[in-house]
Each structure stands twice: as structure tokens, then as C-alpha cells.
């Protein structure tokens, strides 16, 4: 069945969500069902790489690590088999494969960053497999710490884990790790406000960045070169964080690899956005748990990932007192994330606060920005708006920019390119939920005219 055919059968009565209520039940990028910046085109099919990998039956299933600024490092290895024979009083309940009885795990860890493992740059440790779960500890002298963009360098160390059977390497995992520690500081600021501050290696970080939504509407077409260009532009603009938005998708490995090397911290959403969550549907909850376990295990080795978030603008953000999904994000998802990671802060949603209103500016982080409001009311009021808002951490603030001239030429007939007209209003997206009832094209023109002076031509506007 196509995505549309599946959705036709969904009964979403009693739930709240923006743009498309039935999307709640479909585990797919939510923005594919239409957003104020994305068309309603829910394609279906395989959108990532497909590989056929030959492997042995008994092998490594996962490797993850924990690194500490002291230089201590633990590498954890999960296998898809055991070498233990578990016994009860009257019977054996698990038989190990005899060929695996003498398996060995070989750990190789670089002692210097940003250089390959070699005879002069690596510590080797071998030990017998102890069961499905195994680990080994190391200490690296004078470790070089990983820092966000603008705060220092991003040294990355190589590691390798090999499964040795009968003197031969039958499976291997390689990766990179970094020494850095993350904390979220929430302490009293004054009598009525609580701080919300991210700390890296014990240092308060002034977070600067933006949302990251899928770089193409059809995500299968995103090339590595585009990830490199966009993330490099973010770094050169002095960003230090990208917020992988909950209405999009868990990004490809290459995205996180580039962020690791560029010092771009990643705020990683679980993929829920702007709606209730049907926590009363057991099948839905089970599916989501499997999804989150897979993604946490896939992403937890990236030093750039510093923050987990249970979803974007769940219904508590809309000043609703009764919402569906609180237990899901507060308990089920929090427990799942902490069980499989536990080294990073987890927030129930964004925005979040310590009161019963998610978008309360007195604590937590808020989407109550002052930028757009000040432009609507007059840019001379900007400083007053900033002061009046009094928010502790602004995690999202809607902003608009133009397309390219080439894009506009593909969108509009030659005689409709400029000035703005009914074609612009028809072919640019809109947000019916916005409190500012100004078409997006006219809002963009307002931004341009207010900040840079009146635009007489399309080129001036762009």
C-alpha cells in the first residue's frame, strides 16, 4: 500500500496535530505530509543506501564507548551470541556454539588524535570473550578534549575492535571517539527564573545555531557534497549547534561525522512534532521503542551529539492542559534513551519548562523569540522586545530568507518575477496557525525592507 492508502484507513478522532492529523500514526518524516515550508508529498519506498554484506553467523552486533576528560575510556562490545552455558537445577537452558568457545576480542586504541592507528600510535589489548556483553578499559595520558566550534579544536581518536576465532579475524568494527563531557545546568537565576545552560567540559557554552530540517523534500536525493557544504557554511557563520528537528528524520551517518569534525553540536530530536502522541496505542508505542533503541545505539558514539529531546512542540506547548503523550515522553522515551545512552541530557520536549506550560519563559527553553515580533511591530522596538521577553534559552525563532534567483525563475513566468504578486502568494507556503496574518512572501519583503532598505528589483530583494 502507498502512504496515502494507509492514511485513508486511519481514524485520528480525538487527537490534535497541525497540518495533517493522520500523520501522527505514520512513522515517516512528518514534514512530508505538508508544513509551512514543505509540500504535501508523502513519497514511499527505499530512500537510503542498500548494501548486501557477507558476515559470519556469530559476530559483533554493537560497539560503543564512554570517554572521560581524565583520559579514562571504556569500550563496550555486544555480540549476537554467548559462550556461557546457563544451567538450572535440572537442565541446561542455553548451549553455546562450540566453535566460539575460545573466541578472543582484540581492542586497539589510538593514543594520539587525528592520526591512524599504527605501531607507534596504538594500545592493543586482547581478552577472551566472556558472554554477549564485554568491555575493556583504557587510560590515555594527556587527552586532548573535543570542543564546540569557537571554543577549541575537535581532536578525534581512532579505535578498532576485532573478533578473533581460530587465529583469524572474523569480524571487525572501527570508529572514532573523543574526550568531552556534557552537562545541563538548571539552577536558580533569581526568585522566579531558572537557568538553562549547556556545559561542555565544565564550561558554559553560548549556543548559536539553527534548526536542521531535511535538506531536500525527497530525502533520497541528498548527496554527501550538500551535507559538506551546508554544515561548513554553518561553521563559517559561527554556528556551534544544529537542532535536528523532530518533524524531519534521523540523519545519515555522514551528517554526524561532519558535525564531529567541525565542532557543530547536535541537538537530536526523537521524531515527533507538533501534535499529540498516541500513547494509548500499544502497537504504536512498541514500534516507536524499537525505532528509538536503534537510533540511540546508532548515534551515541558521536561526540557532536550533546542533547536528546523527546519531540518538538508536543501539545503542551500550545497551552493545552490535557495532552496525549506526556507519559510517553516523560517515562517511556526517557527510560529508553537513558538505558541505552545515559551520557547526555534528555528533555521531554521542546519547548519545555518546570511549570505545566511548555512554552513558559521562566524556566527550561522556549520558542518565545523576539525577532519576528519586533520586525512586525517595528525594528526600533527590537531591544525592548528582547528585554520584555525575558526568556532563559530561546531554542527556536522563526526566520525567513529568500530563495535564489534561479529558483524563482523556475517558479514564476518571466513577467511575474517582480514585483510580488498573486503568483508569489499562491506558490509560497503559508502557516495558518501563525498569529501574524501576513502572507509569507510579504513577510519576507518586510524583513528585507526593514533591515536593508526598499527592494526595487528581484536581485536587490534576494
List each model region and its residues:
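Secreted/periplasmic carbohydrate-active enzymes, especially glycoside hydrolases
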Residues: 1-242, 250, 261
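Active-site rim elements
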Residues: 34-38, 320-323, 456-462
Amino acid at each position: 500500500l502507498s502512504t496515502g492508502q494507509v492514511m485513508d484507513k486511519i481514524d485520528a478522532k480525538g487527537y490534535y496535530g497541525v497540518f495533517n492529523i493522520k500523520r501522527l500514526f505514520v512513522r515517516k518524516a512528518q514534514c512530508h505530509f505538508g508544513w509551512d515550508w514543505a509540500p504535501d508529498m508523502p513519497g514511499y519506498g527505499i530512500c537510503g543506501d542498500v548494501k548486501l554484506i557477507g558476515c559470519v553467523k556469530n559476530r559483533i552486533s554493537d560497539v560503543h564507548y564512554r570517554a572521560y576528560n581524565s583520559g579514562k575510556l571504556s569500550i563496550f562490545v555486544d555480540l549476537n551470541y554467548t559462550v556461557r552455558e546457563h544451567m538450572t537445577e535440572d537442565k541446561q537452558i542455553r548451549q553455546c556454539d562450540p566453535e566460539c568457545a575460545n573466541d578472543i576480542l582484540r581492542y586497539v586504541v589510538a593514543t594520539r588524535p587525528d592520526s591512524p592507528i599504527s605501531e607507534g600510535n596504538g594500545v592493543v589489548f586482547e581478552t577472551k570473550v566472556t558472554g554477549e556483553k564485554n568491555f575493556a578499559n583504557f587510560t590515555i595520558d594527556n587527552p586532548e578534549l573535543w570542543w564546540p566550534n569557537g571554543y577549541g579544536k575537535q581532536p578525534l581518536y581512532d579505535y578498532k575492535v576485532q573478533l578473533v576465532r581460530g587465529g583469524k579475524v572474523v569480524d571487525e568494527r572501527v570508529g572514532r571517539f573523543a574526550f568531552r563531557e556534557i552537562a545541563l545546568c538548571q539552577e536558580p537565576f533569581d526568585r522566579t527564573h531558572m537557568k538553562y545552560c549547556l556545559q561542555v567540559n565544565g564550561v558554559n557554552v553560548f549556543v548559536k545555531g539553527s534548526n536542521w530540517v531535511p535538506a531536500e523534500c525527497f530525502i533520497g536525493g541528498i548527496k554527501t557534497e550538500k551535507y559538506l557544504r551546508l554544515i561548513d557554511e554553518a561553521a563559517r557563520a559561527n554556528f556551534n549547534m544544529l537542532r535536528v528537528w523532530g518533524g524531519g528524520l534521523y540523519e545519515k551517518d555522514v551528517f554526524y561525522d561532519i558535525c564531529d569534525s567541525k565542532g557543530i553540536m547536535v541537538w537530536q530530536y526523537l521524531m515527533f512534532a507538533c501534535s499529540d502522541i498516541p500513547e494509548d496505542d500499544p502497537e504504536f508505542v512498541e514500534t516507536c521503542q524499537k525505532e528509538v533503541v536503534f537510533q540511540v545505539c546508532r548515534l551515541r558514539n558521536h561526540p557532536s551529539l550533546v542533547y536528546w529531546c523527546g519531540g518538538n512542540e508536543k501539545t503542551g506547548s500550545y497551552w493545552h492542559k490535557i495532552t496525549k503523550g506526556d507519559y510517553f515522553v516523560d517515562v517511556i522515551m526517557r527510560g529508553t534513551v537513558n538505558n541505552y545512552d545515559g551520557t547526555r541530557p534528555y528533555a521531554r520536549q521542546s519547548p519545555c519548562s518546570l511549570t505545566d506550560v511548555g512554552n513558559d519563559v521562566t524556566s527550561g527553553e522556549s520558542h518565545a523569540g523576539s525577532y519576528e515580533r519586533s520586525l512586525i511591530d517595528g525594528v526600533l522596538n527590537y531591544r525592548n522586545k528582547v528585554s520584555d521577553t525575558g526568556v532563559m534559552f530561546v531554542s527556536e525563532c522563526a526566520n525567513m530568507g529568500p530563495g535564489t534567483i534561479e529558483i524563482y525563475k523556475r517558479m514564476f513566468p518571466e513577467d511575474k518575477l517582480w514585483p510580488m504578486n498573486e503568483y508569489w502568494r499562491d506558490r509560497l507556503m503559508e502557516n495558518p496557525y501563525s498569529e501574524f496574518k501576513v502572507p509569507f512572501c510579504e513577510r519576507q519583503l518586510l524583513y528585507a525592507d526593514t533591515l536593508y532598505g526598499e527592494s526595487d528589483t528581484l536581485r536587490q530583494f534576494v
